[in-house]
């Protein structure tokens, strides 16, 4: 069944009264060329498992299925479930719909065997960053997914791929740089969405590193949260609540430096210094 044999998305949205909810961070994609481009960015999807978070009325879902994927779609907006069920009827056995909150989902339990899924999603803007942090800090590593192809606001995308000495370097850049290789694949203009957001969006492609620098994810998460939570303060002050003086002494890192001047390797050293 081709993507063109399904009713137009605008018709589906009107029939099911699916106006996007700001409270859920929803911005629906209508452009079939764009949804197909996002799906292609994830690689060859023929007979491959894919996790999609926040499918809404199913614009990207259609593109993923048309390219041969087996899709597990997680949607917390009950209004969208009937529209997704109609898509599932066109692709028997290829679309699994889970009604629920992705932030509460145990993703590692979704695919207990077989090839690792790819995560492909136009993430709801209000939970996208937290979901990414969860996926970057997940244990064990290598993770449950083989790659991530995700839509973010452009400013968030720049923070994900940021390197030391760049304006956008921060906690996301450290954690993504530690465990993955991330790149901005392409931009998506506001007019591609309904309703159009006020900012440009970007698709980011993320591939896990098989062997990142040895470090406890929980410790690195804590260190980066403290350091960048007060990024304008010196490290001896921003890390004070988590025993920063001892950590800085152990690692030989100057306490008068600020978080934005530390490399990924130096953050890993601080996290490892947390070990008893």
Curated annotation (Swiss-Prot):
An example GO CC term for this entry is: cytosol
Catalytic activity annotation: adenosine(1518)/adenosine(1519) in 16S rRNA + 4 S-adenosyl-L-methionine = N(6)-dimethyladenosine(1518)/N(6)-dimethyladenosine(1519) in 16S rRNA + 4 S-adenosyl-L-homocysteine + 4 H(+)
- Among its keywords, does the record have Transcription? no
InterPro entries membership:
KsgA/Erm, rRNA_Ade_diMease-like_C, rRNA_Ade_Mease_Trfase_CS, rRNA_Ade_methylase_Trfase_N, rRNA_adenine_dimethylase, SAM-dependent_MTases_sf
**Positions with a binding annotation for S-adenosyl-L-methionine:** 27, 29, 54, 75, 101, 122
Chief localization: cytoplasm
PROSITE patterns (UniProt xref):
RRNA_A_DIMETH (PS01131), SAM_RNA_A_N6_MT (PS51689)
Looking at the keywords, is Coiled coil present? no
Where found, per UniProt? Cytoplasm
Molecular functions per Gene Ontology? 16S rRNA (adenine(1518)-N(6)/adenine(1519)-N(6))-dimethyltransferase activity; RNA binding
The EC code for this enzyme is 2.1.1.182
**NCBIfam families from the UniProt entry:** ksgA (TIGR00755)
> Which HAMAP family does UniProt cross-reference here?
16SrRNA_methyltr_A
Protein family according to the UniProt entry: Belongs to the class I-like SAM-binding methyltransferase superfamily. rRNA adenine N(6)-methyltransferase family. RsmA subfamily.
Main role? Specifically dimethylates two adjacent adenosines (A1518 and A1519) in the loop of a conserved hairpin near the 3'-end of 16S rRNA in the 30S particle. May play a critical role in biogenesis of 30S subunits.
| Protein name listed in UniProt | Ribosomal RNA small subunit methyltransferase A
Q: What is the lineage of its organism?
A: Bacteria, Pseudomonadati, Pseudomonadota, Alphaproteobacteria, Hyphomicrobiales
Originating gene: rsmA
